[in-house]
Amino acid sequence: DYYYRAGVDLTKITEIPKLMPIVNAKPDSELLSDLDATAAWAKSQGGDTGRLGIVGFCRGGRSVWEYAAHSSQLKAGVAFYGSLIDPPNPLWPKSPMQLAGDMKAPVLGLYGAEDQGIPPAQVEQMKAALAAAGKTAEFHIFPGAPHGFHADYRPSYRKEQAEQAWGEMQAWFRKYKVLT
């Protein structure tokens, strides 16, 4: 697990306010290095990195955008409600919005219309920035869905939207040959 280096078993933390300081203390440089190492390890084990894809939720969704701007090996990504605009932070030097012009892989962004942290207006900003840069991305903003609509262990779970989003993710990965 990426966060295990913090010395804490994140599976034992059930309160988001206790979890986020640990999650947010990880620098982008370490994340990208770890993802590169994971892809290299998969290749060394016989994995077909010609079909390399990434999916993430919340902070992991942000990581999808970051890795799509970083890796020329990546074939496609899917970001479930990943943040697009970050407050200034030396650990995260650029937000996904600032990296729009650097995207190297197509990304599908799946967001909730009722997300209090990532309002639809931000999603539209990202969509416009990517289009202006000539990058490939699609977005779906799900009506009635809050942040975390795919987390079936939380009150934010929305079964219908989660199932639809999962199907869209699979179709996206098939389109870009990550899945067959």
Predicted regions and their residues:
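N-terminal cap/leader regions of alpha/beta-hydrolase-fold enzymes
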Residues: 1-180
